[in-house]
Design a protein with these regions (language model features):
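Transmembrane helical cores of multi-pass secondary ion antiporters/exchangers
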Residues: 1-418, 422, 429, 437, ...
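Soluble N-terminal domains of membrane-associated systems
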Residues: 442-454, 460-528
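Long, amphipathic alpha-helical stalk/connector segments used for oligomerization, subunit docking
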Residues: 407-468
């Protein structure tokens, strides 16, 4: 199997793993990792050599951008303290603990190389956290914190990693210089992210066409990452800043086509890139195994020790961190935004899977130092890193669904439905208010006014059928039944129209572009 065919298999696997994972109640990223491991059987696939300097720039920007689209600035600020405790403080603590243990158990491992190992295994993967948490029906507050942690911990870890690698390669280290580098990297990244977000927002207003606007959103994450890296800033933080800016300001209320099509396009991108990323993790396993070269027992022992450190440090940190977060938020009346039970804390602890970023950083370790000597214990670091990635991703990823079901941690569906219902009522009332405003300045026929009033009510019923239940209780049962009947008949009429247009594709002389254009009109009409 050549590399092109292998890439195609990963793409197909990315699509198939979603329904298979839903049936098996297993996260799709874990299934893709297992597929990569199966494909990595010696002799079945070629030795896949992926340039490490391309993994982060190619995979992370779209994945991070897609993840940020599911959150908001309000959610981020509401969970700021818990996120900082996990995404910044915990990364530092995990790096220090892993470095200390690795320096003690791996003979001759320099402290700078040990810190590099600690930094690359410290951050839970944002893609794994988002993909796994999103499929398990976890409470929104818990998902928000996991997503926030996953999105921002890479920034801290990557800067620590670069500082440690520079120290190991040059043989010298300066804490003041490292601190200055961290601050400058963050400042440059935020500046680039805001500037590109503002420019992209203005350009989207200028383009107007939905196809071009969506195409621009596909390019913006890469532009943000590359520009920040060229200016010695954090590409990851720049992408996050740009995505948050555009999520708040990019699309107006009337950008319907861009919003509908954009969600579909980004769902496809997210599914495919996530699948390929985790498939590559499994494929890289055979490269890590080759580095053991007869020292299986010893190196597996080192990897197991680091896995234990990573898992235990997260637990020991989370217990006081969640207590502190509860105290802080209680004073600001934000209790609903943080884990309030020990069950949710346990789920958060077991959700610390490592993934794409750790793989990229492990593969990016240089081969030589400035003096031309081999990088100290590079093979050992790579093997230990992949041991941690596989143990956390596969073991925790496979057992997390069982743990969630066992503990009974799930989203409050009743509260979500009530919120959806309240929004539906607000939307319908806003439509009615606007109709009254128009009637004050325009004279509308009574029949038209009544029809428009029914449409305003139907807006609420379409969003949340429970709005109709309320109307029924208020004595409007007949009107609700008539509206639902009309919707059913209109749906059947539009279905017949679509079938007729699709049949025209196979008629002699039919212009497929015209057929598609008419079909798009019918599709949009069906969504109303």
């Amino acid at each position: 199997m050549d590399q092109l065919a292998l890439f195609f298999v990963l793409l197909v696997g990315a699509v198939v793993s979603v329904p298979v994972g839903e049936r098996l109640k297993l996260p799709a990223p874990v299934l893709m990792t297992l597929l990569g491991i199966a494909l990595a059987v010696p002799g079945f696939v070629p030795n896949v050599e992926i340039p490490p300097e391309l993994i982060l720039p190619l995979l992370l920007p779209p994945l991070l951008y897609a993840a940020v689209r599911r959150t908001s600035w309000r959610q981020f600020t509401a969970n700021l303290r818990p996120i900082l405790l996990l995404a910044v403080a915990l990364v530092f603590v995990t790096t220090a603990a892993v470095a200390a243990v690795a320096n003690a158990i791996v003979p001759g491992l320099p402290i700078a190389a040990a810190v590099a190992l600690g930094a690359l295994v410290a951050p839970p993967d944002p893609v794994a956290a988002t993909a796994v948490a999103g499929q398990l029906g976890l409470p929104r507050r818990l998902v928000s914190i996991l997503e926030g942690e996953g999105l921002f911990n890479d920034v801290t870890a990557i800067v620590l990693y670069h500082v440690a690698i520079a120290a190991a390669v040059s043989g010298s280290f300066s804490w003041p210089r490292a601190a200055l580098q961290l601050v400058l990297s963050a400042v440059v990244a935020v500046a680039v992210g805001v500037a590109l977000g503002w420019a992209a927002n203005k350009l989207m207003d200028f383009l107007e066409d939905a196809t071009l606007q969506i195409g621009l959103t596909l390019l913006v994450p890469y532009a943000s990452y590359v520009m920040a890296e060229e200016l010695h800033g954090s590409g990851v933080l720049a992408v996050l800043t740009t995505a948050l800016f555009l999520a708040e300001y990019a699309l107006g209320a009337d950008d319907v086509l861009t919003r509908l099509a954009g969600h579909t396009v980004w769902d496809v991108v997210d599914t495919l890139v996530t699948g390929v990323a985790f498939g590559l993790i499994g494929l890289e396993l055979h490269n890590a195994i080759r580095t053991a070269s007869g020292r299986w027992g010893e190196m597996l022992g080192w990897a197991a020790a680091v896995v234990v450190v990573v898992v235990l440090v997260r637990l020991v940190w989370l217990l006081p961190a969640t207590w502190l977060a509860r105290r802080w938020h209680a004073k600001r009346d934000y209790d609903e935004e943080i884990p309030m039970s020990w069950r949710e804390t346990v789920v958060m602890w077991w959700s610390g899977m490592r993934g794409v970023a750790s793989v990229a950083l492990a593969l990016a370790i240089p081969l030589e130092t400035e003096s031309g000597a081999p990088f100290p214990d590079r093979d050992e670091i790579v093997f230990i890193a992949f041991g941690v990635i596989m143990a956390t991703l596969v073991l925790q990823g496979l057992t997390l669904p069982w743990l969630v079901r066992r503990l009974g941690v799930r989203a409050d569906e009743g509260a979500e439905k009530e919120f959806e219902k309240a929004l539906a009522v607000r939307a319908a009332k806003a439509a009615k208010r606007r109709l009254k405003e128009i009637e004050e300045v325009e004279e509308l026929p009574e029949e038209m006014s009544e029809r428009l009033l029914r449409r305003a009510f139907e807006i609420g019923v379409r969003i949340s059928p429970e709005v109709g239940e309320d109307e029924r209780r208020e004595g409007h049962e007949q009107r609700v039944r008539r509206l639902r009947r009309m919707r059913r008949i209109q749906g059947e009429m539009l279905s017949a129209a679509r079938h007729e247009v699709l049949a025209a594709r196979s008629e002699p002389g039919a212009n497929p572009e015209v057929v598609d254009r008419v079909l798009r009109h019918l599709d949009v009409r069906s969504l109303r």
